[in-house]
């Protein structure tokens, strides 16, 4: 069987390509490998984070699958950063930037080397959208493999438990020994953060999108299932090459609607809004933030998963993973079953023989007994967010909040105020100049929101920002406010003591100040100087579009 070699043939075929072949012999090529399709394996392996510390071994498994199926696998690395380590620091400004670097680097290596297809393997949060953006741009047969979830720490803790313990320590609820004990036992080994945080959210979205093999999103990082997933992905890429099925054949508008539906049902992260829009942009699909509202009206939240719920991703793995949930949604008419996937089959065919969850499990509810009858991801508008903002409201916080503003021009100031007991019940914490351009980089506010929870203020205060939130954040929070403060959005002129209302029922975010006063404040406002004028952050600030457009750079 002759497998298409559209790109590698241009690199290695013919007498004039002898120098290229000469360079490939030392890396393990044999003469007969030059007649095989070359598949790049984009590995995000790194020792900077436990999310990715095992991915080199998974890349080896994918290479084995490719080679066994008649291709030639070639492993290369792209970067990862650690959100969990950089959170609350200046370094977090590089997090969203890393999404673009990952996409750019995959596009660069694959385009340069002439790979016919790609298997990309990711672990930490930005790996998932970064890989998919790169694959969509290239539009060569491709599969994404998720690195898998971490096991829970002692007493079912994880890294978010440590962030919240900081607030408890500040509140004198635990002592230094207890804090250190949590610190040492919460993160147990390899794998992505264990709740329905951003990594697991995006992995689930990508599987629903059709770009991963079935249940790739719901496997433990260190497991036979994950090893087999990688081998099978390597084999499946040869099927995609034979059938010439490319990412843009899979990543259609209907497929993105499936992804949105699944992440709503799972109670997923607000980051999904930003990243799915960016992924759609790369695939030339016109996905908008209002599509989340449209779909969210008919899709309930049915997964009792952290951070708002009780259970960990590893516990969802134990009861069957995401496939039975997707089958429930398909049978209810909430998914498009005719969408193509990387199996070479439609979503409906992939799910045909999936067994239902056991009646005894308590993690996934029935559709007629939801945790919330519609989406927890709310797109808010009003004079504070003319172009939209994103809230994650599970219902446990209530559906509206009215309070007085306490304003900060950066995350660090807000965190210090929370830990020093300067935030009181009824306050709306306003953190601004943290947007894609103003930060730059749109940092995640896990440190302050976790401190709020640790201080016992959850449900008593709200927090709004033009920055982002970690998937580990819970509480009454609104992010992605556009226009951002640095661009002259109304957020820039909110003053301490101003009343703000957040109405998630009617999707409203409003500053309760007369328009004439707002206009007067805006007329006196001047744009701050950029925080960076050289380097990658400066480049990102110049190129990045608004959060409502996915903060894309192309």
Swiss-Prot record:
GO biological process, one term: L-valine biosynthetic process
SUPFAM superfamilies noted in UniProt: IlvD/EDD N-terminal domain-like, LeuD/IlvD-like
Sites bearing N6-carboxylysine, chain numbering: 126
Pathway(s) where this gene product acts: Amino-acid biosynthesis; L-isoleucine biosynthesis; L-isoleucine from 2-oxobutanoate: step 3/4; Amino-acid biosynthesis; L-valine biosynthesis; L-valine from pyruvate: step 3/4
Enzymatic reactions: (2R)-2,3-dihydroxy-3-methylbutanoate = 3-methyl-2-oxobutanoate + H2O; (2R,3R)-2,3-dihydroxy-3-methylpentanoate = (S)-3-methyl-2-oxopentanoate + H2O
Positions of the catalytic residues: 470 (proton acceptor)
InterPro entries reported for this sequence: DHAD_IlvD/Edd (IPR050165), Dihydro-acid_dehy_C (IPR042096), DihydroxyA_deHydtase (IPR004404), DiOHA_6PGluconate_deHydtase_CS (IPR020558), ILV_EDD_C (IPR056740), ILV_EDD_N (IPR000581), IlvD/EDD_N (IPR037237)
Annotated residues for binding of Mg(2+): 83, 125-126, 444
Iron keyword on record: yes
EC number: 4.2.1.9
Binding site for [2Fe-2S] cluster: 51, 124, 193
Subunit structure: Homodimer.
Identification of the protein by name: Dihydroxy-acid dehydratase
Species the sequence originates in: Vesicomyosocius okutanii subsp. Calyptogena okutanii (strain HA)
């Amino acid at each position: 069987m002759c497998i298409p070699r559209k790109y590698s043939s241009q690199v290695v075929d013919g007498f004039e390509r002898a120098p290229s072949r000469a360079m490939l012999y030392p890396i393990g090529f044999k003469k007969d490998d030059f007649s095989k399709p070359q598949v790049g394996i984009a590995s995000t392996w790194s020792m900077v984070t436990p999310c990715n510390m095992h991915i080199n071994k998974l890349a080896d498994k994918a290479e084995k699958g490719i080679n066994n199926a008649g291709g030639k696998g070639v492993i290369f690395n792209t970067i990862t950063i650690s959100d969990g380590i950089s959170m609350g620091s200046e370094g977090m400004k590089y997090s969203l930037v890393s999404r673009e670097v990952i996409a750019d680097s995959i596009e660069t290596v694959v385009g340069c080397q002439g790979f016919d297809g790609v298997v990309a393997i990711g672990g930490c949060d930005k790996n998932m959208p970064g890989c998919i953006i790169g694959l969509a741009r290239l539009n060569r047969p491709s599969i994404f493999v998720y690195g898998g979830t971490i096991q829970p720490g002692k007493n079912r803790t994880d890294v978010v438990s440590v962030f919240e313990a900081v607030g408890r320590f500040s509140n004198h609820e635990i002592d230094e020994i207890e804090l250190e004990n949590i610190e040492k036992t919460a993160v147990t080994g390899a794998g992505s953060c264990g709740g329905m945080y951003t990594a697991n959210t995006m992995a689930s979205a990508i599987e629903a999108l059709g770009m991963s093999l079935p249940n790739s999103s719901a496997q433990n990082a260190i497991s036979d299932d994950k090893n087999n997933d990688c081998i099978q992905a390597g084999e499946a890429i040869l099927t995609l090459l034979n059938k010439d099925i490319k990412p843009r054949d899979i990543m259609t508008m209907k497929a993105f609607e499936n992804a949105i539906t699944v992440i709503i049902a799972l109670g997923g992260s607000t980051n999904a809004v930003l990243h799915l829009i960016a992924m759609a942009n790369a695939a030339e699909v016109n996905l908008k933030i209002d599509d989340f509202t449209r779909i969210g009206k008919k899709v309930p939240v049915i997964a009792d998963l952290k951070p708002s719920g009780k259970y960990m991703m590893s516990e969802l793995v134990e009861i069957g993973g995401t496939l039975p949930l997707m089958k429930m949604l398909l049978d209810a008419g909430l998914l498009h079953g005719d969408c193509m996937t990387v199996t070479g089959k439609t979503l409906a065919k992939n799910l045909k023989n999936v067994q239902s969850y056991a009646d005894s499990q308590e993690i996934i509810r029935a559709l007629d007994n939801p945790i919330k009858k519609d989406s927890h991801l709310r797109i808010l508008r009003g004079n504070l967010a003319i172009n939209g903002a994103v809230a994650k409201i599970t219902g446990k916080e209530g559906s509206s909040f009215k309070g007085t503003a306490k304003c900060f021009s950066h995350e660090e100031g807000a965190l210090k105020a929370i830990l020093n007991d300067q935030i009181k019940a009824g306050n709306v914490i306003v953190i601004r100049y943290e947007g894609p351009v103003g930060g730059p980089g749109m940092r995640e506010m896990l440190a302050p929101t976790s401190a709020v929870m640790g201080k016992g203020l959850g449900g008593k205060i709200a927090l709004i920002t033009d920055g982002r939130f970690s998937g580990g954040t819970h509480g009454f929070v609104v992010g992605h406010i556009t226009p951002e403060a640095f661009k002259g959005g109304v957020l820039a002129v909110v003053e301490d003591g101003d009343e703000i209302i957040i109405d998630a029922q009617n999707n409203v975010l409003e500053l309760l100040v007369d328009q004439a006063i707002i206009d007067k404040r805006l007329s006196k406002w001047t744009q701050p100087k950029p925080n960076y004028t050289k380097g990658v952050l400066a480049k990102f600030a110049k190129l990045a579009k608004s959060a409502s457009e996915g903060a894309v750079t192309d």
